[in-house]
C-alpha cells in the first residue's frame, strides 16, 4: 500500500497450540495505480521468511480488480505461501485449486452480503448511477450470503492440502461445505 497508509499490511497469529500463521494483505495495481508495486510489496513481506520453518502457514488476502493480475501473482508466489485468496470484485470465482507447488488459490472469494443486489448495493440506485452518475448508493437489505474458503495446510511444510469454497445462505448456490461441517471437522463450538 502507499507509504503512510493506516494499517499493518501483515500480522502474525499464534494459535493456542503454538502454530504461527502470517497473514498478508496486498493491494494490486491494475486500475489502482497509486498502490505500491504489489509483487515487490509481497516479496518484502516475505523477505528472509521460509514457509514451514518460520511460519506454519502464510495466507495472502489479495485485493484487486483484474483476474489476470491475481492469477499472475499466485503463479509467481506458488510454493512460497500457503494460500492466496483474491478479494474486491464482490463476485466469487469458481477456480479454487491447489497450484503445482502447493499454494491454494481462488481468484476471488466474493463478498459477504446480499447478492440480490448490484455487488451489495441496492439495485435501483446502482442502476440509476450508470445513467445519471449522481446516485448515492446504499447497502442492499435482505438475506446475505457468506462467502469464503476453507484451506487445510500441512503443519510442517506449510503447503496446502485442500481448498474448499464456502457459500452459505442467500440466493447463490450453496457449497457442500458449510459452517456446521467445518465445526464438526475442527471441533468448533457452533
Spans of features found by a protein language model:
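Acidic, metal/ion-coordinating pockets
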Residues: 1-190
